[in-house]
Amino acid sequence: LMSITGVPDGEPGAGPVKVGVAVSDLITGLYASNAIMAALVEREQSGRGEYIDLALLDSQVAALANQALNFLFTGQSPQRRGTAHPNIVPYQAFPTQDSWLMLAVGNDRQFEAFCRAAGRGPLAEDPRFRSNADRVAHREALIPEIEKACRQKTTAAWIRLLAAAGVPCGPINNIAEVFEEPQVKHRKLRFDVAHAK
């Protein structure tokens, strides 16, 4: 995981970076809870118990998902790309006037909508960027254009504009900002409990 996490080689600050939380532990716990539920169903149906064998390594290798598949199909180890997705462009963080925006353009229709909303219509018509495969192949030409566009507005302005256009995006919040997010409050993801003392 660390080999594909961090700043790309050749850029300032390059090198592997630890993920900000104990992701292997969390994923293994989720896999374990699913395995336990499946074992309980089996016991209920057949009366037999199950032996669950799960290691952190198993979970981490499984969690490599598309990155592992990229390697298995091509034989080439994926490289670090910072916040960029290896197979979808543009799908990464961009600096705005005041902070950062995570842009998640998952298909050609969304790319066209982004270009129109950003006032960069010609990008959608450029043959280098017509399909996702084209955008992946010409990533180095496209990303600087999107960076220029994103720096023209605040993150909040982009979120309003792109939400109206149907383009997935969101702010990159620090932890304090996370707990102030309206949806986090609505979902009651923070709650206070009384301490014994």
Language model regions located:
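Active-site-adjacent "lid/gating" segments in soluble enzymes
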Residues: L1-V105, E112
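Short coil/turn segments at secondary-structure boundaries
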Residues: V17, A84, P127-R128, I159-A163, ...
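Alpha-helix/helix-capping structural signal
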Residues: S59, R109, N173-A176
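Short secondary-structure capping/turn micro-motifs that flank functional sites
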Residues: Q60, S131, V178-F179
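Aromatic-enriched alpha-helical interface/lid elements that frame and gate functional surfaces
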Residues: V89-A165, C169, P182
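A glycine-rich dinucleotide-binding beta-alpha-beta segment and adjacent secondary-structure elements
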Residues: A164-K197
